Amino acid sequence: MDEREKILQAQNLTVSFRTNEGMVRAVRGIDFDLYKGETLAIVGESGSGKSVTARSLMGILAPNAVVDAGSILYEGVDLLKLKEDQFHKYRGNKLGMIFQDPLSSLNPIMKIGKQLTESMLLNEKISKKDAKERALKLLAGVGISDPERRFNQYPFELSGGMRQRVVIAIALSANPEILICDEPTTALDVTIQAQILELINAIKEERRLSVIFITHDMGVVANMADRIAVMYAGKIVEYGTADEIFYQPAHPYTWALLASIPDLDTKEKLESIPGTPPNMLFPPKGDAFAPRNAYAMAIDFEEEPPLFQLSPTHYAATWLLHPNAPKVEPPKIVTERIKRMRTLGGEA
């Protein structure tokens, strides 16, 4: 039994979108928990449902979204049942979010200072002077030099990395307990990416935050996540501790993601995942990954696999784990990478 304190719990979360062509089944009955002080990474390709999951948590789904089923429990309250005016108590104050593109996350015609202090002045009994003082501390706290000057600048006057630091400061301005990071480094170059990841880790430790980190890149979460949920076609197909996912991956899709991580220490050819994700207007029968899976069996095209338990913390939805399935090893590139990580003593 896990004795850590659970801060958030999603149960059977199911989200669709109305379109002219029909209903797009974006998230299909997922379950996950978030514990106090941990980082949970949700990893998957574009269209896997990971960002829709993040927006469901924040109550900021598009107008054509439909929550078909499920619950999101925070401190015993089902966030999905709240009206918009009730959600204000939680959005920002309890749950903060860092978005993918810092430029589109900021108002281009509003000064940085106003964007930082706006929610403070609206939601708290605080003077403009105190709000500015807190904003300057936030800017300094996220590594922005000369915060007084930046306070009076517009977003276009800052670099991409600087803008993302401002977005992080805004997300922290109401002292949330949970920080949701939706691909926060995708729009940045590699050097700046590393700095932002380091900053998020430092803020998490300093503020004792719980973090949900959304990404398509397994390499990004290697040194960040405590646990990882791998999503494909709106479902969680593997779920475990970071060590379990990196050292004992069980789902062929997880193998494919690990094989596609660039490795600068070897001359291995960069692997790609064949085919494309399914059209979720017409969710496939059986295992959604089967058409792209070199290890697929006949049953994969007919029946959806359940989550098989490998350990108290590790689950994977693949028929390869059925007792009657043939024994299959991960591809050579994955097993060699695991051996290398173990030899180097690398922590996932």
Regions found by a protein language model. Name each.
Residues 45, 59-60, 180-184, 188, ...:
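P-loop NTP-binding/switch modules centered on Walker-like glycine-rich loops
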Residues 67-78:
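Conserved ABC transporter NBD signature motif
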Residues 78, 130-149, 258:
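Conserved ABC ATPase "signature" region
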Residues 79-96, 122, 244-249, 279-284:
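ABC ATPase NBD coupling module
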Residues 173-177:
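A short, proline-enriched helix->beta-strand linker immediately N-terminal to the Walker B motif
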